[in-house]
Amino acid sequence: MRPTWKALSHPAWPEEKNKQILVLGLDGAGKTSVLHSLASNRVQHSVAPTQGFHAVCINTEDSQMEFLEIGGSKPFRSYWEMYLSKGLLLIFVVDSADHSRLPEAKKYLHQLIAANPVLPLVVFANKQDLEAAYHITDIHEALALSEVGNDRKMFLFGTYLTKNGSEIPSTMQDAKDLIAQLAADVQ
């Protein structure tokens, strides 16, 4: 009988586990700014959109969380589903003030979550400080979040990042705490 690869693997080598928190959303939604702000507890605006992949580790009192942001422009969206299977949870960032792109964001979000019906989902309705921003109840409706499934943990946060260098708003801290708890629960 031929041994399987698993039998040949070294016992000290850990099996590959889902360990990254994916940060996805259309280009211009504010994913990088949100991620940097979560990491540093300070508002840090990003100017250029992510071209490719951006990984960030955030330490909490109890653990270390690995975030993987994948660019939101069309050439990079094809990678989203490939990495989804390796994710602990999905953070999906939308620009609350960009009304014309919400149907596109909804389409991609629903394609992603259809592939994994139990993957926890955290939606950031970003740029809530802008005058044109939809309220989170409007974002909930525009993204059809009531259709994400009963087996999935889903959370929606209205977020904004104001002055560069200032402390992150309490909503962002609450979101960070929740993400840490969700990640710990899934692992």
UniProtKB/Swiss-Prot annotation:
Pfam families: Arf. CDD domains: Arl9_Arfrp2_like. GO terms for molecular function: GTP binding; GTPase activity. Transmembrane segments: none annotated. GTP binds at residues 25-32, 69-73, 126-129. SMART domains: ARF, SAR. Keywords: GTP-binding, Nucleotide-binding. The keyword Nucleotide-binding applies. Gene3D superfamilies: P-loop containing nucleotide triphosphate hydrolases (3.40.50.300). The keyword Cell division does not apply. Signal peptide: none annotated. Belongs to the small GTPase superfamily. Arf family. This is ADP-ribosylation factor-like protein 9. It comes from Homo sapiens (Human). The gene is ARL9.
